[in-house]
C-alpha cells in the first residue's frame, strides 16, 4: 500500500482463518472419502454374481483419512489450491501378514485355473468353458477351493457331469422336437425320428475331469475341442438339419432335395396308404444306406426297385415302376406300404446326388 504523505510502501499479508467444522463437513462429503470409508480394508477372495472367483486388494492404495484431512486443513490455511495425497504421505504402507500372503497366492492359482482355453465346437457354433464354469467345478470349503495333498484343486465330478448334461440338453439333436421352415411356407413342429447327434456324456465328463487341471489348457490360447458322440449327425449345432436335406411334405405329396441351400430336385410322390393305416410316419430321419436293384419284401408283396434309399427301418425312398401317376390324393386310398414312391427319373437323380447321412424331414 502506498503512503501518499511520506511516500513509503508496505506489504500486507492476509490472515486466513479456517472454519474447521465446515471444512470437515465438506471433506466428509467428498466421493473418495465416502468410498474409502466403505472400502474393504483386507484381501478378499470370493465368487461374484457371474460365478467366477475375483480377488479384491483392500490393502493397496489405502488412505489415512485423518492424515489427509489435516493435510487439507494445512493446504487451505496456506492459501494453496491443490493437495497431493501421495506427496503428503497420506497413504498407508501396509505389509501383508502370512494369512494375507496365503490368500493372495491362492488367488494366483485360481486365476490361472479359471483362464481355461477349452472351447467346445458344435459345427459352426463355439461354446467356451468360462471362468464361472471352472469355478463351479471346484470342491470348496467355507467358499474357497479345496486342494489335495499335492496342492492341486479337487474337482466336483457331479458338477462336471451336470455341466456336460447341460451341453447335451442344448446341442443334442437326437429325439429333439424341431421347428422346420417348410417349402410351402409355414413353420412345422416335428417330433421324433432317427436323426440327430447324441453327446457321449460319460466320455466328455472324463475328458473335462482329466484336462481341467492340465496346465496345457491354461496358456491363454484357445483350444478347440470336438466332443465325442454316441450318435453322429450330418450337421452339428442347434440347427443340425443344416442346408442340405430331403424334405417330404406328405400333405402336398411333394419331395424336395436341397443342397447347400439350393433346390436341386422337386417331384410329386406317393406316401403310405392312409385308409389302410399305413401312413408314412412323421419325423426327422436320415439316409442310412443306398442300394440299386433291390427287391422290397413284406407281407403279401415283393417289389423290385432300381434305386433304394432307406431312411427309417424298412421305410425308404424308391422308384415305383408300377405307378403311372404321382401326387394328389392317391396316398389316401391307394398309397404305399409306408415308403415314399417316386418317379424313376427323379429317383435316379436323387440317388446320384444324395449322400449317406443326409437328413430327411418328413411331415404332414
Go through the PLM ranges and name each one.
Residues 307-353, 358-362:
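Active-site scaffold segments
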Residues 1-302, 307, 354-356, 361-364:
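Surface-exposed, secretory/extracytoplasmic low-complexity segments enriched in Ser/Thr/Asn/Gly/Pro
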Amino acid at each position: 500500500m502506498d503512503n501518499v504523505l511520506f511516500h513509503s510502501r508496505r506489504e500486507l499479508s492476509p490472515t486466513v482463518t479456517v472454519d474447521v467444522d465446515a471444512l470437515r463437513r465438506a471433506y466428509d462429503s467428498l466421493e473418495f472419502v465416502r468410498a474409502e470409508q466403505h472400502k474393504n480394508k483386507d484381501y478378499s477372495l470370493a465368487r461374484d454374481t457371474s460365478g467366477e472367483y475375483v480377488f479384491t486388494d483392500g490393502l493397496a492404495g489405502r488412505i489415512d483419512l485423518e492424515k489427509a484431512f489435516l493435510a487439507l486443513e494445512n493446504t487451505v490455511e496456506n492459501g494453496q489450491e491443490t493437495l497431493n495425497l501421495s506427496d503428503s504421505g497420506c497413504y498407508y504402507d501396509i505389509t501383508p501378514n502370512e494369512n494375507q500372503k496365503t490368500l493372495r497366492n491362492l488367488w494366483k492359482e485360481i486365476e490361472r485355473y479359471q483362464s481355461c482355453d477349452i472351447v467346445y465346437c458344435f459345427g459352426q457354433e463355439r461354446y467356451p468353458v468360462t471362468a464361472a464354469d471352472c469355478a463351479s467345478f471346484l470342491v470348496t470349503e467355507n467358499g474357497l477351493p479345496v486342494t489335495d495333498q499335492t496342492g492341486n484343486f479337487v474337482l466336483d465330478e457331479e458338477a462336471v457331469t451336470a455341466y456336460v448334461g447341460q451341453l447335451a440338453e442344448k446341442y443334442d439333436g437326437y429325439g429333439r422336437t424341431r421347428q422346420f421352415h417348410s417349402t410351402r411356407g409355414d413353420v412345422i413342429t416335428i417330433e421324433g425320428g432317427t436323426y440327430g447327434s447324441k453327446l457321449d456324456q460319460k466320455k466328455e465328463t472324463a475328458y473335462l475331469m482329466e484336462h481341467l487341471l492340465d496346465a496345457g489348457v491354461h496358456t491363454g490360447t484357445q483350444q478347440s475341442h470336438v466332443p465325442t458322440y454316441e450318435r453322429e449327425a450330418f450337421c452339428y449345432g442347434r440347427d443340425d438339419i443344416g442346408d442340405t436335406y430331403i424334405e417330404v411334405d406328405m400333405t402336398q405329396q411333394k419331395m424336395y432335395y436341397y443342397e447347400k441351400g439350393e433346390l436341386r430336385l422337386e417331384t410329386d410322390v406317393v406316401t403310405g396308404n392312409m385308409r389302410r393305416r399305413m401312413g408314412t410316419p412323421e419325423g426327422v430321419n436320415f439316409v442310412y444306406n443306398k442300394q440299386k436293384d433291390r427287391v422290397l419284401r413284406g407281407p403279401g408283396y415283393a417289389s423290385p426297385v432300381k434305386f433304394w434309399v432307406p431312411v427309417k427301418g424298412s421305410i425308404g425312398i424308391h422308384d415305383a415302376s408300377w405307378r403311372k401317376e404321382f401326387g394328389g390324393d392317391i396316398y389316401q386310398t391307394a398309397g404305399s406300404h409306408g415308403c415314399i414312391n417316386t418317379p424313376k427319373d427323379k429317383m435316379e437323380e436323387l440317388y446320384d446326388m444324395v449322400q449317406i447321412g443326409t437328413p430327411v424331414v418328413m411331415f404332414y
